[in-house]
Amino acid sequence: MWIKELELKHYRNYDHLLASFSSGLNVFIGNNAQGKTNFLEAIYFLSLTRSHRTRADKELIHFDHSTVSLTGKIQRISGTVDLEINLSDKGRVTKINALKQAKLSDYIGTMMVVLFAPEDLQLVKGAPSLRRKFIDIDLGQIKPVYLSELSHYNHVLKQRNSYLKSAQQIDAAFLAVLDEQLAGYGARVMEHRIDFINALEKEANTHHQAISNGLESLSLSYQSSVVFDKKTNIYQQFLHQLEKNHQKDFFRKNTSVGPHRDDLAFYINGMNANFASQGQHRSLILSLKMAEVSLMKALTGDNPILLLDDVMSELDNTRQTKLLETVIKENVQTFITTTSLDHLSQLPEGIHIFHVTKGTVQIDSDIH
């Protein structure tokens, strides 16, 4: 899939923008603080209904206005789809082909994106919440039912934690009802995650071995707070541990086990990647991003859109070449932001170059 056209109204520093793109490489050049990242964020937001930079929707609204509108024309294998998101003080409205979508899981996945931004380099050593978010964003696009089950899980988790904080003593019967619901949704969330990580590991290892010229292997491990011996009995094990932890959870006023506390670990040649070099970290993240692209295509039959936000300067020539080889080979529409073309020596011919200045975008008259 690829985005043919994007229109922004009152988005960040863009008062109004209407732009068309190549199905291949699109490079956005400009000085810092001109709107390059805002532009990629808009594509990301149109896809996922959320920003990767802020949780506050009001920060996305142009300072002179009270509403935001984003519309995009997406070319999928199945045909053209129009997406639309409108933000105001009354809330958010999402539409597909002008039809309002009641559920997030009905909208997300229509346009798939993979974002590679400088903050992704913190994925290995950062907080577990970053790695859970990484899983949730990818898996939610590939399998929308996952988002629905995760939403139900979080709703019951909030109820359980609220009860634990307010209760003066344990009501075992009431907790048992919540435990059964939480274990049911939580087990399905974990099953989806485990399947996803197993599939991602195969793709990521293939890319990582290519980047390292066969010198390194990459493995991934889903680290669950729920102890279980096989995937088929997660529900029973989860339920048992919830029941066993009633006193502890009551004392701590929160739920001590479940997918909300799970993590993801990375290993290079069997060694924990926390102890890897900076160069190895870059190779690992690059392998993951290329694996995301490959896996989304393998599981959905359609390519995602790749967003590279000021990361090419973080990669040496070898890693740049490997990334662009994958992009070209897989025919992935790609958006690259940069302050200069100096470190993009490996770019092929036929790219579209756009110049970004103070919230305006101008296509280069000469296609490179």
Swiss-Prot record:
Record Pfam families: SMC_N (PF02463)
Gene Ontology biological process: DNA replication; DNA synthesis involved in DNA repair; double-strand break repair; SOS response
Subcellular location: Cytoplasm
SUPFAM superfamilies on file: P-loop containing nucleoside triphosphate hydrolases (SSF52540)
GO cellular component: cytoplasm
UniProt KW Amino-acid biosynthesis keyword: no
Keyword field: ATP-binding, Cytoplasm, DNA damage, DNA repair, DNA replication, DNA-binding, Nucleotide-binding, SOS response
GO molecular function: ATP binding; single-stranded DNA binding
Signal peptide: none
Chain sites annotated for binding ATP: 30-37
Cross-referenced InterPro entries: DNA-binding_RecF, DNA-binding_RecF_CS, P-loop_NTPase, RecF/RecN/SMC_N, RecF_2
Keyword DNA damage among UniProt keywords: yes
Protein task: The RecF protein is involved in DNA metabolism; it is required for DNA replication and normal SOS inducibility. RecF binds preferentially to single-stranded, linear DNA. It also seems to bind ATP.
Record family assignment: Belongs to the RecF family.
Protein name per the record: DNA replication and repair protein RecF
Originating species: Streptococcus pyogenes serotype M5 (strain Manfredo)
Lineage: Bacteria, Bacillati, Bacillota, Bacilli, Lactobacillales
Gene name, Swiss-Prot/TrEMBL: recF
